[in-house]
């Protein structure tokens, strides 16, 4: 909601959001069950829809059904609850939606706040998102540019600025906690830690975030 209110300062906004939490859905699409779409709110220049599918489903629903041939000036995905730096971009539903939107030829940005707390302050991060939105709209980009933007936790006066950088090399080292349900059957919870393979590199998103900068990573689809 915080970034929606910021975006409204620039013009008409259409929000298409998943009905349920979609963390880790990456670029998944719904193929073997129907999608449902409902109107949640209409208020001035704001229209909000809820979609039963994945973040990428929401983008496809927007471009191929709701927009009816229109191309938005900018696609915004997020603000995500938690970092999408380094290899996490490949697991991210937030970035899956941003990348999908760029396929349609319009600029897009995925926004994430490096805070998993239930009391995370999205209002502060929305202030920084406003500058990114303003800069991208002012640049009048006519290419499918996609940015992965991560905002570190902190008060506005603690953030040192924006840093254009590259994706850090690393991987998640997972563990599975095994427990038993009331019927004695095993079930598992996934957990793990991120292993940074280049902790001393100063040109990466992980370094930028650890040193109080907002990381801005241009994303390319051609891998």
Where are the predicted features?
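Glycine/threonine-rich flexible loop motifs
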Residues: 83-92
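C-terminal accessory domains and tails appended to enzymatic cores
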Residues: 142, 146, 152-223
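Hydrophobic/aromatic beta-strand patches that form the interior of the parallel beta-sheet core
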Residues: 14-16, 49, 76, 109-111, ...
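Short, glycine-/small-residue-rich phosphate/pyrophosphate-handling segment
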Residues: 109-135
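Short glycine-rich anion-binding loops that position phosphate/pyrophosphate groups of nucleotides
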Residues: 54-55, 80-83, 154, 221
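Hydrophobic/aromatic ligand-binding patch that stacks against planar heteroaromatic rings
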Residues: 97-101
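A cross-family phosphate/adenosyl-ligand binding-site feature
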Residues: 5-64, 70-71
């Amino acid at each position: 909601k915080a970034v929606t209110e910021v975006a409204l300062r620039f013009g008409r906004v259409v929000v298409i959001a998943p009905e349920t939490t979609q963390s880790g859905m990456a670029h998944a699409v719904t193929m073997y069950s129907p999608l449902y779409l409902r109107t949640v709110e209409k208020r001035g220049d704001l229209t909000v829809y809820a979609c039963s599918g994945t973040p990428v489903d929401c983008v496809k629903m927007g471009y191929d059904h709701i927009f009816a041939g229109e191309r938005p000036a900018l696609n915004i995905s997020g603000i995500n609850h938690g970092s999408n730096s380094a290899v996490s971009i490949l697991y991210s539903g937030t970035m899956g939606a941003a990348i999908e939107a760029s396929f349609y030829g319009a600029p897009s940005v995925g926004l994430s706040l490096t805070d998993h707390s239930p009391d995370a302050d999205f209002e502060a991060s929305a202030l920084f998102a406003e500058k990114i939105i303003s800069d991208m709209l002012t640049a009048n980009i006519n290419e499918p540019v996609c940015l992965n933007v991560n905002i570190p936790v902190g008060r506005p006066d603690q953030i040192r600025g924006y840093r254009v950088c590259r994706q850090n090399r690393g991987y998640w080292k997972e563990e599975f906690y095994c427990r038993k349900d009331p019927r004695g059957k095993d079930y598992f919870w996934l957990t793990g830690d991120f292993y940074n393979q280049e902790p001393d590199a100063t040109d990466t998103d992980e370094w930028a975030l650890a040193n109080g900068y907002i990381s801005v990573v241009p994303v390319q689809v051609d891998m």
